């Protein structure tokens, strides 16, 4: 990385938010935290001063999370985005995908996640272990995204655990890399910073 990466962090009122903030700071990033009830114009004006927008986990649906979805839409083409859990779901919604109740509610469960062994997941164990905390899931992936990590479900179905829009530099993960249940979470966050800058 050249210079100190600057992260604009959108806090969606989640108890995990500051664990993520701490991880980015530990890796040398300067992190500016704003809550999702901040006016959109205030956040939009700050985007160009940052290398990465992080959309945090949070409760509820993406559409109900304050300025989350409109901010993501205002960010496209201006700044890379990393969405975690609710942030991942919001990327899907902002780009025309769909989010629905998950077939299983999972809160604090370690899961085996498969991946495409490319990009931020290159060289990760196949599968790797990640912490899941969600009751919603992306059920229709937007056309511009490719699924890069998933969980094998009954009947051969794949539940998206990560997706990326390469052209617009949008990356979302359903699992929580900052959780102690995610063995390589710190490595993933370090790679996300490198990817962004």
Predicted region positions:
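Active-site-adjacent helical/loop segments in soluble small-molecule enzymes
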Residues: 17
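Cysteine-nucleophile active-site neighborhood
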Residues: 6, 50-122, 129, 189
